[in-house]
A protein has these predicted regions:
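N-terminal Sec-pathway targeting helices
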Residues: 3-18
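Intrinsically disordered, low-complexity sequence elements enriched in Ser/Thr/Gly/Pro
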Residues: 7-8, 29-30, 55
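Hydrophobic helical h-region of N-terminal Sec-dependent signal peptides
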Residues: 17-25
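Hydrophobic single-pass membrane-insertion segments
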Residues: 27-39
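Mature, Sec-exported extracytoplasmic domains of Gram-positive
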Residues: 36-431
Length: 431
């Protein structure tokens, strides 16, 4: 006992410290052992099987995939027409839209021979990407569509079966539901099937764009629904319409000439009127003849006159035009003298050249079309020209009477112009 007391007295503190250490170590080891035991006995919760769960999940995924596929398909179809106005909802049912697309493909099948030898190239998604599509091919396509009973049109060509548009417009004016589809053959060969719908006092268009694969195989490239703000079929025969939301950087209104125009009037328009401006200079907006021809002379007019005379785009050097070229063309095309030209059109004696003044495009300009003509005994021709200003809903804004003198070499001279205001004010012209 004494030995124990002595031991405790001499080493008591050390013994107590060792006991404390042992206890602490035991606690720590016990905690770790407990954690290990918990980890060993823990099992993931048991899943209670539900007999239809996989089936329902599979169906949901399938439905989502279908919806995504339809959305992607519709998005892909319309993506190339992102710049055009779109309606939030369509007046047509899905079945009606499907029938219109089927009919468009039937119409396209009529044209396989026209497109069978086309060459395709890389290009924009909204174009046909046909390397070359001629005016003759466009006219043949319009004729074939017309013979098959479709309303069809292309630039500078009379519309086929135009009576259908007249019937549609008559129904619209009587507040009767109606539809009509126009097949437009564009310059690049793309065909736009535009269906106008009047229903529930609303106007819309449903557009189906038809492109072409090699060998003349048609395909639907685009579809689009757009709200229409107004339509107008003029007495002279222009179908003019406006989108509810106008196309950015485009005309205020779109149009087709519905009633036919004679080939001779189209020929005279192309030769004498096409390319002349009502807004950039005074040739068409001033009453003039040989006595006051100086009133229409200004440098900016030469670019258009050069193109009409030569069929080419004017190119200049240092913004000057050689005097011999300028004076030859202007004295041929107008009853003017060289002296008058040099006084009015920016002639520079040192360089023997004329100033080139660039024409900047004006928004929404009118254009002229020959609607009548008279071949006079003296060899001149009198043209009756209507100013068409579709952007302001007019196909006869003003009327020009232009006298021209054709020459044996194919050139001609403008001799005079008279303009009469009709539905709209005459533009101011150049400065």
């Amino acid at each position: 006992m004494e030995d124990v007391k002595w031991l405790l007295k001499k080493y008591g503190f050390l013994i107590v410290l060792m006991v404390i250490i042992v206890v602490i170590i035991s606690i720590i080891l016990g905690k770790r052992s407990s954690e290990k035991n918990v980890e060993k006995v823990w099992e993931p919760p048991v899943e209670i099987p539900f007999s239809n769960e996989n089936e329902i999940r599979s169906n949901n995924i399938a439905e989502e995939n279908i919806e995504e596929s339809e959305t992607e398909s519709e998005s892909d179809t319309e993506s190339s027409l992102w710049f055009l106005p779109k309606a939030e909802n369509c007046l047509l049912t899905k079945a009606e839209k499907s029938r219109l697309k089927d009919t468009a493909m039937v119409a396209a099948e009529q044209l396989k021979d026209v497109y069978k030898d086309i060459e395709l190239e890389e290009g924009v998604s909204y174009g046909s990407n046909i390397r070359e599509f001629t005016k003759e091919q466009r006219r043949e396509a319009v004729s074939l569509l017309g013979n098959a009973g479709f309303v069809s049109v292309t630039e500078d060509t009379n519309m086929e079966n135009h009576e259908e548009i007249e019937n549609f417009y008559a129904a619209y004016m009587e507040n009767r539901d109606a539809m009509v589809t126009i097949y437009e053959v564009n310059r690049d060969g793309l065909i736009g099937a535009v269906t106008f719908i009047y229903r529930d006092n609303r106007l819309q268009t449903y557009y189906v764009g038809i492109g072409w694969q090699g060998g003349g195989i048609p395909e639907i490239k685009d579809t689009l629904v757009s709200d229409i703000a107004e339509i107008n079929l003029t007495e002279k025969g222009y179908f003019i319409y406006a989108y509810e939301n106008p196309i950015a950087h485009s005309s205020l209104r779109q149009y087709w000439r519905v009633k036919p125009l004679s080939d001779k009037c189209r020929e005279l328009t192309a030769k004498y009127v096409y390319g002349l401006s009502y807004v950039n200079y005074n040739v068409l907006v001033t009453n003039w003849d040989s006595n006051n021809v100086e009133d229409i002379l200004m440098p900016c007019m030469f670019e258009d006159i050069y193109r009409i005379y030569t069929g080419e785009i004017l190119s200049t050097e240092n913004w000057r035009i050689p005097a011999d070229i300028y004076e030859k063309i202007m004295t041929t095309c107008f009853p003017v003298s060289i002296e008058q030209l040099r006084e009015k059109c920016g002639y520079d004696e040192d360089s023997n050249s004329y100033e080139y003044e660039m024409i900047f495009a004006s928004p929404y300009p009118p254009f002229g079309e020959v609607v009548d003509y008279t071949e006079n005994p003296d060899g001149t021709t009198t043209l009756v020209v209507d100013g068409v200003w579709a952007d302001y809903n007019s196909d006869c804004a003003f009327t020009n009477t232009i006298v021209v003198q054709p020459f044996d070499d194919g050139t001609f001279r403008y001799l005079s112009n008279l303009i009469e205001q009709k539905e709209l004010e005459v533009p101011k012209g150049g400065r």
